[in-house]
Amino acid sequence: MERADNTYVQLCGRFVVELHGRRVDQRFPSRQGRPLFAYLVLQRPRAVGRDELVEALWPSDPPAGHAAALTVLLSKLRAALGADILEGRGTVRAALPPGARIDVEQALVSLHRAQSAVVQGEWARAWSGALCARYVTERPLLPGLEDLPWLEVWRRRLEDALDDALEAYAAACLGLGGTEIAGAERAARRLVEHNPLRETGYKLLMQTLAERGNVAEALGVYERARIVLRDELGISPGPAIHDFHAELLGR
């Protein structure tokens, strides 16, 4: 029996599909093969109706004969993957082997574990989980494909996941201390840059700078946060960042 753990799907960054250790994505049909397969994979384990697949591939202007075009696409995709990977006719399901690894799924699971570990103060476990999530979410989902609403929804979800992963990674590095403080600062700076309206990024950056003895710079970060939040949202910094700012002033 072939090992399921040799089956891997990479949707972020370079598109890769390996079945039992063998690359098959080069055999995918035309430009539509990638989004069709990706949509089915991201819907797992749900079976997807043909009308939904047409909407996923051609959201604004389905071609004439789109039902036949979808049938041809599915046939070619089955030829590339093997008939057992795409189950069903009226509805279609991606039936990857048990234990198959999909980068997006792995990132979201790793992120959840990292966030749980942060809450529990298990810094090493949080660090590894957040790093795994960052590795995937820092790369674009299906680059080169545009104008697909479902893809934009998933991209926004992964953008949010990247924010969460950066936050968990910075917190884990702070918890570990020592040489990891530099990593905490880099992650916090990246979070502030990526989402300047997220207060936790500023607090983590202030904490890392204070930990390294740069209290004046940490106070400057608070001022930056105050101005951004005031100008963009019309609010003041929340209690967590405000209280840490007061603590720094008392040092």
Please identify what each model-predicted range represents.
Residues 25-32, 39-45, 58-68, 72, ...:
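Intrinsically disordered, charged and Pro/Gly-enriched terminal/linker segments
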Residues 47-56:
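Short acidic, hydrophobic short linear motifs in intrinsically disordered regions
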